[in-house]
């Protein structure tokens, strides 16, 4: 049995057509079903519906053989027990710093609000910059407006939400897209099956971008 961990939303919507190219189609609509384990048209493949930030955990610990997660989630997770064999080139965006439009660069310690705490620590450590990281789970744009933080680090798609709140994107940390991740033990135990799926998905990604 192959178990694939996915999260609802944009990643799920963009991944299902790629899986369909490999003949893997859920027997129920994951967006409408309350089930968290969903069978597919292939008897030996099932989908797990989990939180986006939990996908790498399920895969690394072997609760799922494969998963699809954003590069931002994988960078923050930083686990060692999984392979990342394929960039699916879906759910593309940017991980960036942002601050109030026209604001002067703060002197001294920088206050940064983000849910990407590990990414932020690594990023500013590489710059040799002293920072105070403030962990938030949402509404990052609010932090600079009420002087909770000088800057934020967040995923930016169009930038409209930033601009609507008087902020502007500043430094690019990483270009983000969703990646296929594979449990290391599963790759050894079910190598032929998983490699075949990887190859099929790679062809689907390439044909989509050629077309």
UniProtKB/Swiss-Prot annotation:
<dbReference type="InterPro" id="IPR013820">
    <property type="entry name" value="ATP_PRibTrfase_cat"/>
</dbReference>
<dbReference type="InterPro" id="IPR018198">
    <property type="entry name" value="ATP_PRibTrfase_CS"/>
</dbReference>
<keyword id="KW-0067">ATP-binding</keyword>
<keyword id="KW-0963">Cytoplasm</keyword>
<dbReference type="GO" id="GO:0003879">
    <property type="term" value="F:ATP phosphoribosyltransferase activity"/>
</dbReference>
<protein>
    <recommendedName>
        <fullName>ATP phosphoribosyltransferase</fullName>
        <ecNumber>2.4.2.17</ecNumber>
    </recommendedName>
</protein>
<dbReference type="InterPro" id="IPR001348">
    <property type="entry name" value="ATP_PRibTrfase_HisG"/>
</dbReference>
<comment type="subunit">
    <text>Heteromultimer composed of HisG and HisZ subunits.</text>
</comment>
<keyword id="KW-0328">Glycosyltransferase</keyword>
<keyword id="KW-0368">Histidine biosynthesis</keyword>
<dbReference type="GO" id="GO:0000105">
    <property type="term" value="P:L-histidine biosynthetic process"/>
</dbReference>
<keyword id="KW-0808">Transferase</keyword>
<dbReference type="GO" id="GO:0005737">
    <property type="term" value="C:cytoplasm"/>
</dbReference>
<dbReference type="InterPro" id="IPR024893">
    <property type="entry name" value="ATP_PRibTrfase_HisG_short"/>
</dbReference>
<comment type="similarity">
    <text>Belongs to the ATP phosphoribosyltransferase family. Short subfamily.</text>
</comment>
<keyword id="KW-0028">Amino-acid biosynthesis</keyword>
<dbReference type="Pfam" id="PF01634">
    <property type="entry name" value="HisG"/>
</dbReference>
<dbReference type="GO" id="GO:0005524">
    <property type="term" value="F:ATP binding"/>
</dbReference>
<comment type="function">
    <text>Catalyzes the condensation of ATP and 5-phosphoribose 1-diphosphate to form N'-(5'-phosphoribosyl)-ATP (PR-ATP). Has a crucial role in the pathway because the rate of histidine biosynthesis seems to be controlled primarily by regulation of HisG enzymatic activity.</text>
</comment>
<keyword id="KW-0547">Nucleotide-binding</keyword>
<comment type="pathway">
    <text>Amino-acid biosynthesis; L-histidine biosynthesis; L-histidine from 5-phospho-alpha-D-ribose 1-diphosphate: step 1/9.</text>
</comment>
């Amino acid at each position: 049995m192959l178990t694939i961990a996915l999260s609802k939303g944009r990643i799920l919507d963009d991944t299902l057509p790629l899986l369909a190219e490999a003949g893997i189609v859920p027997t129920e609509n994951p967006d409408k079903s309350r089930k968290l384990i969903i069978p597919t048209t292939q008897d030996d493949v099932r989908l797990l519906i989990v939180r986006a930030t939990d996908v790498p955990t399920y895969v690394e610990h072997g609760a799922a053989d494969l998963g699809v997660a954003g590069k931002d989630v994988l960078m923050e997770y930083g686990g060692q027990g999984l392979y990342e064999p394929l960039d699916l080139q879906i759910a593309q965006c940017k991980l960036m710093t942002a601050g109030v439009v026209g604001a002067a660069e703060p002197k001294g310690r920088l206050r940064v609000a983000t849910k990407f705490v590990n990414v932020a620590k690594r990023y500013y450590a590489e710059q040799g910059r002293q920072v105070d990281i403030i962990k938030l789970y949402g509404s990052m744009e609010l932090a600079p407006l009420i002087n909770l933080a000088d800057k934020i680090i967040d995923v930016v798609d169009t930038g409209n939400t930033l601009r609507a709140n008087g902020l502007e994107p500043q430094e690019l940390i990483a270009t983000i897209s969703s990646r296929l991740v594979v449990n290391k033990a599963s790759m050894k135990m079910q190598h032929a099956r998983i490699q075949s799926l990887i190859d099929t998905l790679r062809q689907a990604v390439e044909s989509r971008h050629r077309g």
